[in-house]
Amino acid sequence: MSSPKLTVAVLFGGASTEHDVSQLSVTSVLRELDRDKYELLPVGITRSGEWFLYTGELSLITDGRWEQSDARIPCLLSPVPAHHGLMVQKADGWQPLRVDLVFPVLHGMNGEDGTLQGLLELARLPYVGCGVTGSANCMDKDIAKRLFTAAGIPTARGFTVYRGEVPSPAELAAKVEAELGWPVFVKPVNLGSSVGVSRACDAEELAAAMEEALRYDCKVLVEEAITGAEVECAVIDRKSVV
């Protein structure tokens, strides 16, 4: 006798500047997950934070057309453990929809920064990915660098600039020349997918890069450029075995 399917809520979109990236990612995830093993519940979150259970074609997700589709049902993630999943709006009111596992395919703030993970912990729902502490620490590049440094792990040389405490363009350029050298990369601290990131080779480009990064965040990281290969490593924790 075959095992019952696990019901998996797959979250995508999100109130984030990386909303579009999430829609691309989730399309691949939904195509690859084995539907013989899992009952998939795609849950789209709009930029304004509205949640919908989406039952339409996957092709409409990639470019955001799912938001104009009739195949959307308003829903929300219930923080009440007894509900163990979603609340879905029906003709006769809101009804619980049980979920076995939540798979967030969200990028950036409100998805990878520990906020969603906190909600899932309150709801006592199992989920894919890092916990609250790991998510929050890793989303903030400044805090992550401090933790790596404390652990003796080398990182690129750099410094953090806060909105409201930004030096004059001349002072900032002088600091770069004294501490890092050109070129440098300027990054919003709490974003991913290279949103708001610029490469600066002189004072004029540095000023423009700071202005761009501060559009997205109140804290900006300026780092030396390093030439090398980028290596990605996936880590899976199974019953305390990494």
Annotate the PLM regions.
Residues 1-128, 132-133, 137-143, 147-150, ...:
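ATP-binding N-terminal substructure of ATP-dependent carboxylate-amine bond-forming enzymes
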Residues 36, 123, 179-180, 216:
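Structured helix-beta-strand junction loops
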Residues 40, 126-127, 155, 184, ...:
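Hydrophobic beta-strand scaffold residues
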Residues 46-49, 165, 189-192, 226-229, ...:
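Glycine-rich beta-alpha junction loops
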Residues 147-155, 212:
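Basic phosphate/pyrophosphate-binding loop/patch that engages nucleotide-derived ligands
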Residues 148-149, 176-197, 218-231:
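ATP-grasp fold ATP-binding core
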Residues 198-242:
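Phosphate-binding site of ATP-dependent enzymes
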